[in-house]
Amino acid sequence: MANVTLNVTDNNGKEAGTLEAPEALFGFTAEEVQAHVPLIHQVVVAQRAAARQGTHAVKNRGAVSGGGRKPWKQKGTGRARQGSIRAPQWYHGGVAHGPVPRDYSQRTPKKMKAAALRYALSDRANNGRVAVVDFQLDAPSTKKAIAALAPVVADNFTTVVLSRDNVNEWLSVRNIPTVYPIFADQLNTYDVITAQYVVFSKDGLEAFVAAKTAAKEA
């Protein structure tokens, strides 16, 4: 399989060569990506559902206080019959069929999540929206990080993928409003498709490819 060529820029936004990325991660065609949009959708829906706390709750008529006796006699008052002042139709009454705490998480096979990520990355790569930036930061500097990213992504929302060793890069990009930093071992489909650009640091790309290649061989 032929590899995918990704452009590399330096910390000044100037071209600094290219890097080869595995076709199995970045090289699916637009037709193949389109055919797997339902897969991407299913994985993203499951991920967003798993992020929900599910702690919503209301009190039903058995949980609210009061209402131990019948408010008035059954007949002879001219009013509608009532059995409790805590019935749902009463002010301060219990809620009927209200939400209860629940777990929204869905079971998604690992192979589905891995495949969805590959198709999402391929979609961005097919549209020229995957890049590699060699930040080369000796100390944290948001100004330098902006200078490195601006020529590549302008003001578009960008997911920046870093290795665990890219401490200076992480501290530099985390305060940029249009940038969402994430470590290579945490990259997921949702953070790819919600970004207009996906930018890898050189170490971040190496870490990502190494992890996915090792997982496939295992």
Swiss-Prot record:
**Record keywords:** Ribonucleoprotein, Ribosomal protein, RNA-binding, rRNA-binding
Query: What does the record give under GO molecular function?
Result: rRNA binding; structural constituent of ribosome
**Region listing for Disordered, in residue ranges:** 54-106
- Name the GO cellular-component terms: ribonucleoprotein complex; ribosome
Q: What is the lineage of its organism?
A: Bacteria, Bacillati, Actinomycetota, Actinomycetes, Bifidobacteriales
Originating species: Bifidobacterium animalis subsp. lactis (strain AD011)
Its biological function?
One of the primary rRNA binding proteins, this protein initially binds near the 5'-end of the 23S rRNA. It is important during the early stages of 50S assembly. It makes multiple contacts with different domains of the 23S rRNA in the assembled 50S subunit and ribosome.
User: How is this protein organized at the quaternary level?
Assistant: Part of the 50S ribosomal subunit.
Q: Output this protein's name.
A: Large ribosomal subunit protein uL4
Q: Which HAMAP family match?
A: Ribosomal_uL4_B
Q: Provide the GO biological process annotations.
A: translation
Annotated family: Belongs to the universal ribosomal protein uL4 family.
The question of whether rRNA-binding is a record keyword is answered with yes
